[in-house]
Amino acid sequence: MKLETHNIAVGAGLISLDVLIWDWQRVPISYYVGGTCGNVMMILSYMGWDAYPIARLDGTKDGMRVLDDMKKHHVHIDFVSTQDGKTPVIVQRNFINKDGLPTHKFESRNNIGRFYLDFKSLTLKQANGVIERIDFVPKVFFFDRVSPAILKLATTFKEKGSVVFFEPSSRGGN
């Protein structure tokens, strides 16, 4: 395994498609990579890092929009699968509140009651496949969701000398 001297980050967790809508238009005005992990990978790439998300998306139009946005912003998609995952969608509805100020709200269901936020974590088999294929040691491993596969990645990268950064997805009792 070769050691890299430049900044490389690997991330796992919530990578979604953010759909922004102005309330009075009722049609999407933009589609961007979102989710905590997705945002971190995009920001680090913008700052000159090599960013490698590890994710299970799907091959739908939403999944392809996520991949296209990542590629457009030089995020490496080597470890993003579109075979058996789901692409979470987060809808942000922008509007002017009663005081005349711009604000927004997030929606978790579509107009027929289906949840947008379908997230599928990596499997242990997929994590082991990434560990076998990866030929560098990242400076940072970032994650925002906990699963056996993501913990396996965190442990492996820590043992190789990476800084492991966990940002919990919510403040819960556990």
Indicate where each model-derived feature is located.
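Positively charged, low-complexity intrinsically disordered leader regions
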Residues: 1-25
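Flexible, charged surface loops at secondary-structure boundaries
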Residues: 2-5, 46, 130-138, 158-159
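Conserved N-terminal subdomain of the carbohydrate kinase-like
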Residues: 17-21, 25-26, 49-140
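Short catalytic helix/loop segments, enriched in acidic residues and glycine
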Residues: 24-42
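Alpha-helix C-terminal capping segments
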Residues: 41-50
